[in-house]
A protein has these predicted regions:
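N-terminal glycine-rich FAD/FM-binding segment characteristic of electron-transfer flavoproteins
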Residues: 1-320
Length: 320
């Protein structure tokens, strides 16, 4: 495929976001020249990292309105760059920020936008498979437009290096102050430690856990495995755990090496958040529960007996 793919990069404190490394891998798969745009502060030192992942040109957008995330202003910058360099494809990872910025840019360019694609096949038009209805189905579609604006589903494309020479171009954006409708008024540091989105192991609990106190054995197992505790929406709705622990369409989408789902029925909105897990183990008394039928492995039994037994066996083997 000829032409250029422009990748919208997410970064934080001088480091590329893992999501953007996934987007760069997807862009290289199209067979085009890959260029990237960074918007906001702390992007000056990213060219070497971008070069390591196959980027030929790094466009750095500068403006006082871009120091913090403002979707309207960021979308205007991307739209202006598209008008200037005429890429064939504009691509980002389908995070909240990636989808929001591409939607803003597409609206300004009067072009269609296809979000959360799991497969891209270029030709005279762009054939794609994408997640629909919160991930409950996969849709095959074709995008015909002068510029293809797409995001790729998070956690589905494996980052990999492809070193190349990268030049840097500064983009002096001209922005209307009216675009500054959003501004950051404070930043709150997350407590140090493994996060739900990055943990190698997640032990999730649902309504079947029974109470806030019922999560203690799950926390013990998670600690033994070097992981964290997650939960279903039913748990947060009951006030048993914080929304920050929720796995699902309206919570966090996870992709651990192992997800242990305890007492979780497997409603579609939860499955959307967990389906990228490499291995899923369900523990449930109901052999017909959705999570049990979709899991790679299942234990049919009372989680209050099964979880402590697993934890004890892990400790016994480590001690021997």
């Amino acid at each position: 495929m000829e032409g250029t793919t422009l990748v919208v990069i997410e970064h934080d404190r001088g480091a590329l976001a893992e999501a953007s490394l996934e987007a760069l891998a997807a862009a290289r798969g199209l067979g085009t020249r890959v260029e990237a745009v960074t918007v906001g502060a702390d992007a000056d030192g990213l060219s070497d990292s971008l070069a390591a992942h196959g980027v030929s040109v790094h466009h750095r957008a500068h403006h006082e309105m871009l120091s913090d995330y403002a979707p309207e202003a960021w979308g205007e910058v991307v739209a202006g760059l598209v008008r200037s360099i005429s890429p064939r494809v504009v691509l980002a990872c389908g995070t909240d920020r990636g989808n929001e910025v591409l939607a803003q840019a597409a609206a300004r360019l009067d072009l269609p936008f296809a979000a959360n694609c799991t497969d891209l096949s270029p030709g005279d038009a762009l054939s794609m498979t994408r997640l629909r209805w919160g991930g409950s189905l996969l849709e095959d579609a074709t995008l015909s437009a002068p510029v293809w604006i797409v995001s790729v589903a998070h956690h589905l494309f494996e980052p990999s290096e492809a070193p190349t020479e990268c030049s840097t171009v500064d983009v002096e954006a001209e922005l209307d102050p009216a675009l500054a409708r959003s501004r950051v008024i404070a930043r709150v540091e997350r407590e140090a430690g493994v996060t739900l989105s990055s943990a190698p192991v997640v032990v999730g609990g649902g309504r079947g856990v029974g109470s806030p106190e019922g999560f203690a054995p799950l926390a013990d197992l998670a600690a033994e495995l070097g992981g964290v505790v997650g939960c279903s929406r039913a748990v947060t709705n009951n006030g048993w755990r914080s929304h920050t622990d929720q796995v699902g369409q309206t919570g966090t989408r996870i992709a651990p090496d192992v997800y242990i789902a305890c007492g979780i029925s497997g409603a579609i909105q939860h499955w959307v958040g967990a389906m990228a897990s490499k291995n899923i183990i369900a523990i449930n008394t109901d052999p017909q529960a959705n999570m049990v039928t979709k899991a790679g492995h299942a234990v049919i039994g009372d989680l209050h007996k099964v979880i402590p037994a697993i934890t004890e066996e892990i400790r016994r083997r480590r001690a021997s």
